[in-house]
Amino acid sequence: MDMFSAPDRIPEQIRIFFKTMKQVVPAKAVCGSTVLDVAHKNGVDLEGACEGNLACSTCHVILEEPLYRKLGEPSDKEYDLIDQAFGATGTSRLGCQLRVDKSFENAVFTVPRATKNMAVDGFKPKPH
């Protein structure tokens, strides 16, 4: 890059919050990343057993009503997985399916107190 080229664009960051049973965790979120990735990068215990491949419900989060309405309907596959999630509500979504944008600024994502991981051996994968 020469001195007259445009500088590389810095990804826009916003702030979101994760509400767990013990605390509310502020998190820096890069627009375009998934809520699951943001949770992992900020030390929030949101499982993501399938590593974001829409094959489980362990990254289930509960959204506030205004944000849920703004996002539009989940896919049929996501709906099916939400039906299997522990403590699912009318505003539940999967963190791996939510791409952060500016409309998420200051949003609160509630992390349920448990997940249903269908693994029978007790294995809990580490965040990637």
Swiss-Prot record:
Positions with a binding annotation for [2Fe-2S] cluster: C50, C56, C59, C96
Location(s), subcellular: Mitosome
GO biological process assignments: P450-containing electron transport chain
One Pfam family in the UniProt entry: Fer2
Species: Encephalitozoon cuniculi (strain GB-M1) (Microsporidian parasite)
Cofactor requirements of the protein: [2Fe-2S] cluster
Residue ranges constituting the 2Fe-2S ferredoxin-type domain according to the UniProt record: 12-115
Family as reported in the entry's similarity comment: Belongs to the adrenodoxin/putidaredoxin family.
Domain of life: Eukaryota
Gene3D superfamilies tied to this protein: 3.10.20.30
Keyword set, alphabetical order: 2Fe-2S, Electron transport, Iron, Iron-sulfur, Metal-binding, Mitosome, Transport
An annotated Gene Ontology molecular function: electron transfer activity
Main location: other
Keyword Ubl conjugation: no
Functional note: Ferredoxins are iron-sulfur proteins that transfer electrons in a wide variety of metabolic reactions.
GO cellular component terms given for this protein: mitochondrion; mitosome
Protein name: Adrenodoxin homolog
Record's cofactor remark: Binds 1 [2Fe-2S] cluster.
